[in-house]
A protein has these predicted regions:
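Glycine-rich phosphate-binding segment of PLP-dependent enzymes
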Residues: 41, 47-77, 87-103
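Short clusters of small/polar residues that mark proteolytic maturation junctions
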Residues: 45-46, 147
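Active-site-adjacent loop/helix segments that line or gate small-molecule/cofactor pockets in enzymes
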Residues: 1-29, 77
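PLP-dependent aspartate aminotransferase-fold enzymes
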Residues: 89-148
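Active-site and channel-lining beta-strand-loop segments
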Residues: 22-43
Length: 148
């Protein structure tokens, strides 16, 4: 398939959530992305600033493969070893003693709203109703996140 075939296929098959650049990524290595024509690009976007791991990092890939061989994902209904190990690393690197892991920024915003309301209720006897946020900023696609 050529570049235009990929673009046409994506336009007809994928929900149009963003205006995309006419660039079809084939693979990445380090901080670079490569298109289907082999052209190299320095990746400044990094998953729109939420996944700045780079590409094809051997240490990261090996750790990911080792974890996938054990367990890739479980529900929050269960306790699991990897999440406790991750929590301990966060505690060691910070002054926190409790952590809330999520799968997305939207879930982080929703969790922050709920935590703030719970805090206000515990402190004042009623849930707070005002949220301070950056104007015209992206907070996620859920109803709660869109309301911020």
């Amino acid at each position: 398939m050529n570049k235009q075939d990929y673009i046409d296929g994506a336009e007809s098959a994928l929900l149009h959530t963003y205006n995309r650049f006419p660039l079809v990524i084939d693979h990445g290595d380090g901080v670079y992305l490569y298109d289907t024509d082999g052209k190299e690009y320095l990746d400044f976007a990094a998953g729109i600033a939420v996944q700045a791991f780079g590409y094809n990092n051997k240490e990261y890939n090996d750790a990911l493969k080792a974890q996938i061989d054990k367990v890739m994902h479980t529900s929050n209904l269960y306790y699991n070893v990897p999440i406790m190990n991750a929590a301990k690393r966060v505690f060691k690197a910070s002054q926190m003693n409790r952590v809330f892991f999520t799968n997305s920024g939207t879930e982080a915003i929703e969790g922050a709203i709920k935590a703030a309301k719970k805090y206000a209720y515990t402190r004042d006897g009623h849930a707070g109703h005002e949220i301070i946020a950056m104007n015209h900023s992206f907070h996620g696609r859920s109803i709660g996140a869109l309301s911020v």
